[in-house]
């Protein structure tokens, strides 16, 4: 994966030059994706031009926060800690949510998802405010697997100016992280969006990333991402079945990709002809 390093560095440098910026800002969660992007940005621009925001929520894993803090320190990044608790408490009060308990266990699953998405959008608000204050661009940290599956919050973590890793599947990110010497404790941990306590990507998605990415590669090669007609979609499902993928996986993951198309496209605008 070392051959990806220079193209990613060049991409960041070129995008900033073309847009007239010198600095970037990103959210640093302690996860592997943001660690890879922070490392790439530092290599591309120098640590003095990269700012990291650490934005833990009430249910954030302390280990994740510590990993983010240590990485920012090791990369010599200017960093800022923004606690999301006050925003969450106000939101919960308005919506009648009970936040008592260490891990918000009194919230039902729908409320947990709403709170998680709310936090993702508050984080992006903070990132864009910081970008405005610093005359910087917001860097995205979503990988290709997440983007295709819609596993992210629209106008939350899926909102950014540029993204150097959005063309890499999650399994490629792991290899990339090792090539960049990202700390092993970050590489080894279970992938988690940290939307609520004890949440993990692979539990949510129902499959491990190795299997997911194998499926997505085959799905994409068959034109599945662009398929819009039911007949075409059924034909793709049949081909995937013949390729050895089990029916439940085909149905689950293809439905995720198709149902979340709106997250990958610009808002639809009705155009009037004069």
Curated annotation (Swiss-Prot):
Record: residues binding deamido-NAD(+): 121
Binding positions for ATP per the UniProt entry: 27-34, 141, 170, 192
GO cellular component, one term: cytoplasm
Reaction(s) this enzyme catalyzes, per UniProt: deamido-NAD(+) + NH4(+) + ATP = AMP + diphosphate + NAD(+) + H(+)
GO molecular function: ATP binding; glutaminase activity; metal ion binding; NAD+ synthase (glutamine-hydrolyzing) activity; NAD+ synthase activity
Domain of life of the source: Bacteria
Alphabetized UniProt keyword annotations: ATP-binding, Ligase, Magnesium, Metal-binding, NAD, Nucleotide-binding
Biological or metabolic pathway of the protein: Cofactor biosynthesis; NAD(+) biosynthesis; NAD(+) from deamido-NAD(+) (ammonia route): step 1/1
Pfam family, one: NAD_synthase
Biological process, per Gene Ontology: NAD biosynthetic process
InterPro entries: NAD/GMP_synthase, NAD_synthase, NH(3)-dep_NAD(+)_synth, Rossmann-like_a/b/a_fold
Chain sites annotated for binding Mg(2+): 33, 146
EC class name: ligase
Gene3D superfamilies assigned to the protein according to its UniProt record, in alphabetical order: HUPs (3.40.50.620)
EC number of this enzyme: 6.3.1.5
Function description: Catalyzes the ATP-dependent amidation of deamido-NAD to form NAD. Uses ammonia as a nitrogen source.
Summary of subunit composition and partner proteins: Homodimer.
Family in the record: Belongs to the NAD synthetase family.
NCBIfam families hit by this protein: nadE, PRK13980.1
Name listed for the protein in its UniProt record: NH(3)-dependent NAD(+) synthetase
Source organism per UniProt: Helicobacter hepaticus (strain ATCC 51449 / 3B1)
Lineage: Bacteria, Pseudomonadati, Campylobacterota, Epsilonproteobacteria, Campylobacterales
